[in-house]
Amino acid sequence: MKNIVVTPMTFEPVYEQDAEIVERKGIGHPDTICDYLAEELSVALSKLYIERFGAIMHHNVDKALLVGGEANPVFGGGEVISPIEIYLVGRALKEYKGVTIPAEELAIEVAREWLKDNIRNLDPDTHVIIKPRIKPGSKDLVDLFLRFQQKGEVPLANDTSFGVGFAPLDDLERIVFETEQLLNSPSFKENHPYVGEDIKVMGVRIKDKVRITIACAFVSKYVENIQDYLEKKEHVRRIVEEMAQGLTQRQVEVFINTADDPERESVYITVTGTSAEQGDDGQVGRGNRVNGLITPYRPMSLEAAAGKNPVSHIGKIYNVVANVIADRVVSEIEEVEEAYCYLVSQIGKPINEPQVCDVKVRTKKDLKSLEEEIKRIAQEELEKMPETWKKFLNREYAVA
């Protein structure tokens, strides 16, 4: 259990502080679209590498940029005037031992398929232009990757970087997460097709008062006029408020599209269900962390997990594993109320040998009596780390 440290939390719990802020960007937000397209490309490349070479090869396709298009939404319809442009950028092994990998063609195919499956009112063939820009990686990093892949050894860290995680979610975090999940669930969309996928939820708590502000792109073809829009918006607001109130004892207020000006009929309607059609651009790494939230009152890493290779890229693996360790410590040790986990690597060293694994816990019990069990959990997850890539390929771990 070398380099595993267990320390007490010496600061006030976030949920007991006077103020707290939590955010989540939904699946149709331009930043989240970029995250998912980058990750889907990494998964597709990984599977193709395994098929062709028997192992995942070097790649990092973690740079994506969405340039918003132009659209003219009107009640009852509208049109996309100029398409969205999406640049998928990164590094990937494109040839090995005479075998070529069609990385850019794969990027286009994967992106169109994901958009078709997830943004219902967006036509990936006419509303979007996919522009892949994928080049080979640097020789030293490719060689580092091949060094352990060819020998079947524990992957070596491709960077000196860190990951962090925490558990459990508090009530504001759960409300923000569950609000977006509800509004973007298949059952909700079936009953409320006018709600688009571009949903951003901001939760603010001041003492025991919670304010949830939702930016929700309504789909114009399902909204007849301004009165219909206002009635539908109020209906959604009440549903969210009822759900949110069931998750907390605190007082909850819900607001939707607060920039609307009904008198001028200037409201948040879109043709496609995403502001990417005109109002907003997007980029990998500007949205949710691997637990699906943006939590400025908690420890966070600025690393973008999406699109990074799942075998040795610390910015991806350590953030997920840190959350797993924190979650297991809280769920398996009854006396632990809260846990934070911090992991840091050293480039070129085995990924399961971090420079430090610091687990901070909040407990009313003597920490010494729990230390061995906490270290055991952390060690178990470190030992599993060389197999973590399988769960990314099976989409068991989220990156946004």
Curated annotation (Swiss-Prot):
Identify the InterPro entries for this entry.
AdoMet_synthase_2_family (IPR027790), AdoMet_synthase_3 (IPR042544), S-AdoMet_synthetase_arc (IPR002795)
Supply the enzyme class, top level: transferase
Tell me the pathway.
Answer: Amino-acid biosynthesis; S-adenosyl-L-methionine biosynthesis; S-adenosyl-L-methionine from L-methionine: step 1/1
Q: Which reaction does it catalyse?
A: L-methionine + ATP + H2O = S-adenosyl-L-methionine + phosphate + diphosphate
Gene3D superfamilies with a match to the protein in the record: 3.30.300.10, S-adenosylmethionine synthetase, C-terminal domain
Which parts of the chain are coiled coil? none
Q: Which GO terms describe its biological process?
A: one-carbon metabolic process; S-adenosylmethionine biosynthetic process
EC number(s) reported in the record: 2.5.1.6
Give the protein name, as stated in the record. Probable S-adenosylmethionine synthase
Question: Which gene is this protein's source?
Answer: mat
